[in-house]
Amino acid sequence: MDSTLIKTEVIDELAARAGVGEKVAAITERAMQGELDFQASFRERLALLKGLDESVLSDIADNLPLSEGAEKLISTLKRLGYKTAILSGGFNYFGKHLQKLLGIDYVFANELEIENGKVTGRVKGDIVDGLRKKELLKHIAQKENIALEQVIAVGDGANDLPMLSVAGLGIAFRAKPL
């Protein structure tokens, strides 16, 4: 979803609004350098969002910049009978927004914990990382009776590699260097 279906990284948008953009960027850089794994870096970045007002999520969701051609791609796939899914290490709140906007069939992402209208800095449930994306892709294919060889997956980062490796066609879109 982030930097693929949409042009931005939502966690960076949230961090900027929370006044912790530089701190989050530094943690992201450490993760890119291999100093932190995805789950550790995700939890560390998320903790910095503690106290962010829930209204910020709605504002960001309403202004998500879709990647060029995203609407046409999804509508064409839907018209041709394809099933579509968002499997994201980002946030469910924004995936669900895009699901309504574009008619996506499935959304699996991290659920932000919100209490009393504020982000707690924690996520509910398991973190959607690379291995979880792979499991979810296989689950959807099985549920829809689609052979993995017939699956197309699109991703941009190292945490997409497990998912891309099991798809019949794995596409690196705006890929980050490994």
Name each region found by the language model.
Residues 51, 55-178:
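C-terminal cap/substrate-recognition subdomain and adjoining C-terminal extension
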